[in-house]
Amino acid sequence: MHLVHRDRNYIYNFWPREGESIAQAWGRLKSMLYSCHDHELSREMIIQKNYARLSDNNRTMLDTSCAGSFMMKNIDFKWDLLERIKRNSED
């Protein structure tokens, strides 16, 4: 239980690294999520925290990518957009 609590805290307190792209940060966060299946954080909470901690440029890029406010979109749209950005960066 202690490890789950520790890993949940890592996920909850996740910060993108300076100069890290959206795709890199999302990939790193997804790795944390995968390693801690019992994190009990909703997808909305995960995205909300991640978005709030992105650089201004990266937040603007997400808003532009969805032709409006990223955070006003539904959760499936937001999750899928981040997945597409990550997948496209791997090509």
Model-identified regions with their sequence ranges:
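Acidic, serine/threonine/proline- and glycine-enriched intrinsically disordered segments
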Residues: 1-91
